[in-house]
A protein has these predicted regions:
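Cytochrome P450
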Residues: 1-397
Length: 397
């Protein structure tokens, strides 16, 4: 199957495609972005692939990906293997801690309230949720966290959109990568000269017990990853989550009735049911291996369909419980893969969860009559298979 031949239909609703593939087996050879790759759609096989020692994340070793004219971009945790990955994650985790994330709660709430104030003041009781709320909230949070000046944030939104839009998440225009890398080089240099209380300054300062620290290229790579991944995921979590709630009035009513008890589980179900990241980025087979009963030869490109795995009946079906195609905010025993699994599990997951819970709860409390705008017209979906979401979500209240 060539998924790109069905791009418009697939972008609008990929789940029937995944269901058909899963029914035929957990691993398939198909065409993605004009290139042949293996696609993993079963939950158990996805967990195995995400943590398989023979599946490398090193893009530079693959003929499929022609990234980087900009080496610093690839010097981040997402695109490296142990022991380099282990070292990078250890150094970053020293500063990007649960305590630091939790300390952001009051500021996230303050930013949220300000954006909702601005939405409420718009004429006609209408707004595009993506432009007015889902984008500026996580963009403001991650830029403040890293110490990016306010005037530069619009550029980051543009760069980020250009980088994640391609089908495989790696075919971005080299000029965009070069522009963003050049900016980050200047930002890191400025922080080194005049450090602040932000995370980027902390990453520049941090050293482990042996005196090891991040190199300039590694700092640029980590800033790149945190800025792009640190807001794109949350944009789509908010957008997809609100779409799911509005499409399921019973679930929306239940959440409104008991936000304290249900908001945490609701966000987890949003992540599972229609998560923000559709496919994990490519992995590459270092040796011949078997996955889901399928032989995958050395050098093959492998992509894990997180969205397919999170609707696998083999994982999410049990007697007396709703099936995986049902949106149920009271679902227990989640085990979803929206943030990945294994050594590459998303380090920013706690921040995305914090923002998602505050954003969605506050939105529902502010607008009791929230609904999709009936005059909005057809939805525009994000291109490619990396991210899952809409480019705009017109609402009324």
């Amino acid at each position: 199957m060539d998924l790109t031949a069905h791009a418009e239909e697939f972008n609008a609703d990929p789940y029937p495609f995944y269901e058909a593939l899963r029914a035929a087996g957990p691993v398939h050879r198909l065409v993605l972005g004009g290139e042949r790759a293996w696609l993993v759609v079963g939950h158990e096989e996805a967990r195995e692939a995400l943590n398989h020692p023979a599946l490398s994340k090193n893009w530079l070793g693959s003929e499929l990906i022609e990234v980087t004219q900009v080496p610093a971009v690839a010097t981040n945790m997402l695109d490296t293997d142990p022991p380099h990955h282990t070292r990078l994650r250890r150094l970053v985790a020293r500063e990007f801690t649960a305590r630091r994330v939790e300390s952001l709660r009051p500021r996230v709430q303050q930013i949220t309230d300000g954006l909702l104030d601005a939405m409420e003041a718009l004429p006609g009781r209408r707004a595009d949720l993506i432009a007015s709320f889902a984008v500026p909230l996580p963009m403001t949070v991650i830029c403040e966290l890293l110490g990016v000046p306010n005037l530069d944030r619009a550029r980051f939104r543009y760069w980020s959109g250009e980088i994640v839009a391609p089908l495989d998440g790696a075919g971005a225009d080299p000029r965009v990568l070069e522009e963003m890398t050049a900016y980050l080089f200047e930002l890191v240099a400025a922080k080194a000269q005049e450090p602040g209380e932000d995370l980027l300054s902390a990453l520049i300062r941090t050293r482990d017990e042996d005196g090891d620290q991040l190199s300039p290229d590694e700092l640029i790579g980590m800033a790149f990853l945190l800025l792009v991944a640190g807001h794109e995921t949350t944009v789509n979590l908010i957008g997809n989550g609100v779409r799911a709630l509005l499409a399921h009035p019973g679930q929306l009513a239940a959440l409104r009735a008991d936000p304290d008890g249900l908001i945490g589980g609701a966000v987890e179900e949003m992540l599972r049911y229609d998560g923000p990241v559709q496919h994990a980025t490519y992995r590459f087979a270092d040796t011949d291996l078997e996955l889901g009963g399928v032989s995958i030869p050395t050098g093959s490109s492998v992509m894990v369909a997180l969205a397919a795995a999170d609707r696998d009946p083999a994982r999410f079906t049990a007697p007396g419980l709703p099936g995986p195609e049902v949106f149920d905010i009271r679902r227990t025993g989640q085990g979803h893969l929206a943030f990945g699994h294994g050594i590459h599990h998303c380090l920013g997951a706690p921040l995305a969860r914090l923002e998602g819970r505050i954003a969605i709860r506050s939105l529902l409390e502010r607008f009791p009559g929230l609904a999709e705008d009936p005059e909005a017209g057809p939805r525009d979906w994000l291109p490619g298979t990396l991210m899952r979401g809409v480019t705009r979500l017109p609402l009324c209240w």
